[in-house]
């Protein structure tokens, strides 16, 4: 049997997403999620050949145990033998990695060197890499790292530098790196294809909206600015993350309120955003469903969309020429007609007019243009980060 399928591993701090794809046609053979690592209720669920399955993992199980379960209990011998390479999603590659690379000892060292910028994710990615080497030794030279930061490495200095002492950047790498790059890359290319614009000519603003969220300005096919910064805390209002705040708030929380550094970090990353504004949940669907009847839900939705519209408007200025489309993607971007409507209503100055029927239709797997005839284009495109990872992995290994 030919080895032409790609195993994709996305190791989070307490979870593991996995999939097996055909990199040519995107056909998904297997997908799944193991979660609640290190807890008593660690579990795994998957979909294989159209059939769903789930199981409890041993209490305290983590990445190693989950991968062992996948190989021993889910993968058939035939499917194992068809895996030709392994692609790893890596959240942070720093300045060193500007594109996907075959994993070597030097690459592992490079991922380790930027752990401080992704302290929850990069260590988990390294575990996934080592476990892949152990479980599939015959594929050791066919493991590929695909970096979420790579697409943003085309940002110019004026976009990625903070107005801090330059030595913080020069000596410590303190700058804006962005995130969700694989998603922004995919939907920008897909927008170019659908609009019949060359990839190196397309100008789009891409909005990846999920529990985390970011916006990117893409000019001539390259990212020239993005809303996330040194870490994924900067930028938009998110599920539990504050996004942009006055940095002096941190000093106020510490000096006046007596909060520790750990408490402040926990507040900004896990207790803010939609959760902080609603005081109920980080789920955007709650704010959407209760928008008309609950003041907190309305408040959360308005702040969320206002911040998003501000970024989109500023990126119109940054692109500075013809804008082909605003693209919404991610769980919220693809499914929340309300978020899209409120956001685009802030942009009426630029001629944007939502078509209600189109906007409502573009949900739950449906895509397309959501603005009215004669309006500048805004559209929904479903992201497919796994396909990008599979294609990059195949390009660097199987088809090289």
Curated annotation (Swiss-Prot):
EC numbers: 2.7.2.1
Cofactor entry: Mg(2+); Mn(2+)
Catalytic activity: acetate + ATP = acetyl phosphate + ADP
Gene3D superfamilies, per database record: 3.30.420.40
Localization (cell): Cytoplasm
Residues reported in the UniProt entry to bind ATP: 17, 208-212, 283-285, 331-335
Broad EC category: transferase
Keyword Lyase among record annotations: no
Residues at the catalytic site: 148 (proton donor/acceptor)
Record-linked PROSITE patterns: ACETATE_KINASE_1, ACETATE_KINASE_2
Binding site for Mg(2+): 10, 385
Cofactor binding notes: Mg(2+). Can also accept Mn(2+).
Chain sites annotated for binding substrate: 89
Site (described: Transition state stabilizer): 180, 241
Gene Ontology MF terms in the entry: acetate kinase activity; ATP binding; magnesium ion binding
Ranges annotated as spanning the membrane: none
GO CC annotation terms, alphabetical: cytosol
Keywords, alphabetical: ATP-binding, Cytoplasm, Kinase, Magnesium, Metal-binding, Nucleotide-binding, Transferase
BP terms from Gene Ontology: acetate metabolic process; acetyl-CoA biosynthetic process
Pathway listed: Metabolic intermediate biosynthesis; acetyl-CoA biosynthesis; acetyl-CoA from acetate: step 1/2
Subunit structure: Homodimer.
UniProt function note: Catalyzes the formation of acetyl phosphate from acetate and ATP. Can also catalyze the reverse reaction.
Protein family according to the UniProt entry: Belongs to the acetokinase family.
The protein's name: Acetate kinase
């Amino acid at each position: 049997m030919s080895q032409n399928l790609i195993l994709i591993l996305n190791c989070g701090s307490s979870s593991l997403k996995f999939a097996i794809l055909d990199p040519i046609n995107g056909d998904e053979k297997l997908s799944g999620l193991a979660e609640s690592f290190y807890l008593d209720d660690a579990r795994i669920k998957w979909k294989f050949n159209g059939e769903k399955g789930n199981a409890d993992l041993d209490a305290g199980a983590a990445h190693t145990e989950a991968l062992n379960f996948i190989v021993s209990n889910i993968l058939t011998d035939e499917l194992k033998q068809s895996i030709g390479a392994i692609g790893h999603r890596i959240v942070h590659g720093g300045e060193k990695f500007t594109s996907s690379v075959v994993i070597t000892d030097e690459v592992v060292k490079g991922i380790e060197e930027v752990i401080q910028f992704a302290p929850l994710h990069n260590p988990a990615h390294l575990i996934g890499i080592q476990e892949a080497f152990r479980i599939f030794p015959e594929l050791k030279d066919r493991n590929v790292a695909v970096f979420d930061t790579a697409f943003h490495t085309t940002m110019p200095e004026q976009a990625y530098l903070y107005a801090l002492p330059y030595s913080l950047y020069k000596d410590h790498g303190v700058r804006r790196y962005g995130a969700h790059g694989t998603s922004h890359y995919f939907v920008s290319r897909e927008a170019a294809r659908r609009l019949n614009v060359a990839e190196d000519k397309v100008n789009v603003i891409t909005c990846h909206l999920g529990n985390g969220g970011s916006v990117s300005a893409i000019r001539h096919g390259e990212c020239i600015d993005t809303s996330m910064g040194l870490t994924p805390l900067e930028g938009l209002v998110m599920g539990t993350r504050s996004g942009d705040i006055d940095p002096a708030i941190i000093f106020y929380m510490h000096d006046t309120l007596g909060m520790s550094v750990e408490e402040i970090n926990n507040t900004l990353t896990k207790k803010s955003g939609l959760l902080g504004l609603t005081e109920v949940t980080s789920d955007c669907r709650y704010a959407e469903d209760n928008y008309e009847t609950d003041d907190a839900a309305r408040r959360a939705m308005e702040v969320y969309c206002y911040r998003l519209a501000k970024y989109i408007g500023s990126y119109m200025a940054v692109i500075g020429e013809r804008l082909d489309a605003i693209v919404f993607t991610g769980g919220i971007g693809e499914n929340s007609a309300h978020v899209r409507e409120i956001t685009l209503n802030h942009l009426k100055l630029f001629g944007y007019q939502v078509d209600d029927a189109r906007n409502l239709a573009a949900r739950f797997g449906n895509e397309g243009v959501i603005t009215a005839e004669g309006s500048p284009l805004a559209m929904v495109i479903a992201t497919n980060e796994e396909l990008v990872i599979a294609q990059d992995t195949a390009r660097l290994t199987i088809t090289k």
